[in-house]
């Protein structure tokens, strides 16, 4: 008996994980039966063939994109994920997209070619050519008898009657359409008589529009040196040509509006630009006029006569200031003289002389006293120093019986090593010198 014992829930969960993990999204064709749509909006159905059947579910957010109403007995192509409904243990498919069997095969081819061309870089945004801002000539590659051409011509005539139009007629449906569309694209590029190309047609089924999903058409659009606008079918129709073209228009009429200039809009733009130009000119004129007035005023201020007047006024001002300064100086001097006169009157000169003489006598007495005191102090200090110096004199030492011996060079002899045999030495005593010879 196995050690792993599953519950029913565990088994169903493991089976669901195994199914979902081992099956990527798959394409499946079969006949619809048991189709139901409850109030939730989800679709529940069975897909079957002669030998087997499988339960399927398509949730509401997915089935809203389906362009038809499924019916029992209808053959369809679905893209789905394999799963398992755990509460009942039912193996089922969760449908992502659904197409009638014929269109479904075309849709599968569409997706495969789209992935291939995208991988090669044919859809790269950096390779898209820019449409001219103002086209002088536009080329139209479409059926010469289709309603799309008439819609384009009508809009171009209404919006931009002066725009040159070149029609490159081609089939846009059937076996010959692909080759003719490629041929017209190459012809337009060879002639170089237009600025931009519109490639498109009116609405139709997927089979009707299929020539615009052909690889040859996609590569011709990619090789074109002229900018190309794809305008195939209605807004909901998407083709390979839309991805490769430099710009996609939702309809042929919209493409005509993209390449044409609306005359009324152009006139309005011209009026607006004229207004802006007038306003700019007025601002420039006003600014230049103000500048001219400023320069004229500066020129007037810098005129020699004006400068001379200004200098004269400055000289007069300086002269006036100098006169005021002299007058103030004279008044100050006069005030000082008056003050001195008053002081002289208050203190007569003889009295002041007598007072100064008395002060001078006092200073003389004080000076004599200070000088005598300084001389006495210096004499006493000198006598003290002389006594000390006399005590240190070599003569005093000699007087006490000592003597000083000197070699012939006059240096004092302090050791027997300082003399040699035969040298004459001099001996200094208190009252004279004695010359001796060393034996």
UniProtKB/Swiss-Prot annotation:
GO terms for molecular function: exodeoxyribonuclease VII activity; nucleic acid binding. GO terms for cellular component: cytoplasm; exodeoxyribonuclease VII complex. Its EC number is 3.1.11.6. It catalyses: Exonucleolytic cleavage in either 5'- to 3'- or 3'- to 5'-direction to yield nucleoside 5'-phosphates. Disruption phenotype: Essential, neither gene for this protein can be deleted. Keywords: Cytoplasm, Exonuclease, Hydrolase, Nuclease. The keyword Cytoplasm applies. It is an enzyme of class 3 (hydrolase). InterPro entries: Exonuc_VII_L, Exonuc_VII_lsu_C, OB-fold_nuc-bd_dom. Pfam families: Exonuc_VII_L, tRNA_anti_2. It is found in: Cytoplasm. Its main location: cytoplasm. GO terms for biological process: DNA catabolic process. Bidirectionally degrades single-stranded DNA into large acid-insoluble oligonucleotides, which are then degraded further into small acid-soluble oligonucleotides. Heterooligomer composed of large and small subunits. NCBIfam families: xseA. Belongs to the XseA family. This is Exodeoxyribonuclease 7 large subunit. The gene is xseA.
């Amino acid at each position: 008996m196995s050690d792993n014992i599953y519950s029913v829930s565990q088994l169903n969960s493991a089976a669901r994980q195994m199914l979902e993990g081992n099956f990527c999204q798959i394409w499946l064709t079969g006949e619809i039966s048991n189709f139901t749509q409850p109030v939730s909006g989800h679709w529940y159905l069975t897909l079957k063939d002669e030998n087997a059947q499988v339960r399927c579910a398509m949730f509401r957010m997915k089935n809203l994109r389906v362009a038809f109403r499924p019916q029992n007995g209808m053959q369809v192509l679905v893209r789905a994920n394999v799963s398992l409904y755990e509460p009942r243990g039912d193996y089922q498919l969760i449908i992502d997209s659904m197409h009638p069997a014929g269109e479904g095969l075309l849709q599968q081819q569409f997706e495969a070619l789209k992935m291939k061309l995208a991988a090669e870089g044919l859809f790269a945004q950096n390779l898209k050519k820019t449409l001219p801002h103002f086209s002088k000539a536009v080329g139209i590659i479409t059926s010469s008898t289709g309603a799309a051409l008439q819609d384009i011509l009508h809009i171009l005539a209404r919006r931009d009657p002066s725009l040159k139009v070149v029609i490159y007629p081609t089939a846009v449906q059937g076996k010959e359409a692909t080759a003719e569309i490629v041929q017209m694209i190459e012809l337009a590029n060879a002639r170089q008589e237009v600025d931009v190309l519109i490639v498109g047609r009116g609405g139709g089924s997927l089979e009707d529009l299929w020539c615009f999903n052909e690889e040859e058409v996609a590569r011709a659009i990619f090789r074109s040196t002229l900018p190309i606008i794809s305008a195939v079918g209605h807004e909901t129709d998407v083709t390979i040509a839309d991805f490769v073209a430099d710009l996609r228009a939702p309809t042929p009429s919209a493409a005509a509006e993209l390449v044409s200039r609306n005359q009324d809009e152009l006139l309005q733009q011209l009026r607006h630009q004229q207004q802006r130009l007038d306003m700019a000119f007025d601002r420039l004129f006003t600014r230049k006029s103000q500048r001219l007035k400023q320069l004229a005023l500066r020129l007037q201020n810098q005129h020699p006569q004006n400068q001379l007047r200004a200098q004269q006024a400055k000289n007069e001002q300086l002269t006036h200031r100098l006169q005021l300064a002299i007058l103030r100086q004279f008044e100050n001097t006069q005030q000082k003289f008056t003050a001195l006169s008053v002081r002289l009157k208050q203190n007569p000169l003889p009295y002041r002389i007598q007072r100064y003489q008395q002060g001078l006598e006092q200073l003389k007495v004080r000076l004599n006293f200070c000088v005598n005191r300084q001389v006495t102090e210096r004499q006493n200090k000198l006598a003290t120093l002389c006594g000390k110096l006399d005590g240190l004199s070599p003569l005093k030492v000699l007087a006490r019986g000592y003597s000083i011996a000197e070699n012939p060079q006059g240096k004092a002899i302090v050791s027997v090593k300082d003399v040699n045999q035969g040298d004459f030495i001099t001996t200094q005593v208190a009252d004279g010198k004695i010359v001796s010879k060393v034996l």
